[in-house]
Swiss-Prot record:
It comes from the Bacteria. It catalyses: S-(5-deoxy-D-ribos-5-yl)-L-homocysteine = (S)-4,5-dihydroxypentane-2,3-dione + L-homocysteine. Its cofactor is Fe cation. The lineage of its organism: Bacteria, Pseudomonadati, Pseudomonadota, Gammaproteobacteria, Enterobacterales. HAMAP family: LuxS (MF_00091). Keywords: Autoinducer synthesis, Iron, Lyase, Metal-binding, Quorum sensing. It comes from Citrobacter koseri (strain ATCC BAA-895 / CDC 4225-83 / SGSC4696). It is an enzyme of class 4 (lyase). The keyword Metal-binding applies. Its EC number is 4.4.1.21. One of its GO terms (molecular function) is S-ribosylhomocysteine lyase activity. InterPro entries: LuxS_sf (IPR037005), Metalloenz_LuxS/M16 (IPR011249), S-ribosylhomocysteinase (IPR003815). Involved in the synthesis of autoinducer 2 (AI-2) which is secreted by bacteria and is used to communicate both the cell density and the metabolic potential of the environment. The regulation of gene expression in response to changes in cell density is called quorum sensing. Catalyzes the transformation of S-ribosylhomocysteine (RHC) to homocysteine (HC) and 4,5-dihydroxy-2,3-pentadione (DPD). GO terms for biological process: quorum sensing. This is S-ribosylhomocysteine lyase.
């Protein structure tokens, strides 16, 4: 099985909250697609609660688009990581990490402005696969955590696992 890019970085050295360019690729038509690792939690030390991350998924996608789309950037998708320590964001364009960090913080401020659970987009049986698994208060706790900390930049070069370590791990 091929080694995925996300598993070539040392999760024991990742900072959070932090932005990292996880991957950049070009389409056959010349568009650049950038995948960002938006790390909310320190891997293996913190985890977002399932209801909170699910609610955040519904809110974050729209709020990030409000703050980041434009000037050569269009978000394709924002999805939670299975480990519940962050989100992956795929987009067309190449915004720098600071622009992404600023949009992220603005989106978290928007999450705190949501007053009622019924204001969560697509929160119904028709548009959500587990519409009863939500918590606005947990999502707002996550947002508060981000806003109370500096959003840093994680560098692939600094986090790269050495080849000998990858071999030791049988990868």
């Amino acid at each position: 099985m091929p080694l995925l890019d996300s598993f070539t970085v040392d999760h024991t050295r990742m900072e959070a909250p932090a932005v990292r360019v996880a991957k950049t690729m070009n389409t056959p038509h010349g568009d650049t697609i950038t995948v960002f690792d938006l790390r909310f939690c320190i891997p293996n030390k913190e985890v977002m609660p399932e209801k909170g991350i699910h609610t955040l998924e519904h809110l974050f996608a729209g709020f990030m688009r409000n703050h980041l789309n434009g000037n050569g950037v269009e978000i394709i998708d924002i999805s939670p990581m299975g480990c519940r320590t962050g989100f992956y964001m795929s987009l067309i364009g190449t915004p720098d990490e600071q622009r992404v960090a600023d949009a992220w913080k603005a989106a978290m401020a928007d999450v705190l402005k949501v007053k009622e659970q019924n204001q969560i987009p697509e929160l119904n049986v028709y548009q959500c696969g587990t519409y009863q698994m939500h918590s606005l208060s947990e999502a707002q706790d996550i947002a508060r955590h981000i806003l109370e900390h500096d959003v840093r930049i994680n560098s692939n070069e600094e986090l790269a696992l050495p080849k000998d370590k990858l071999q030791e791990l049988h990868i």
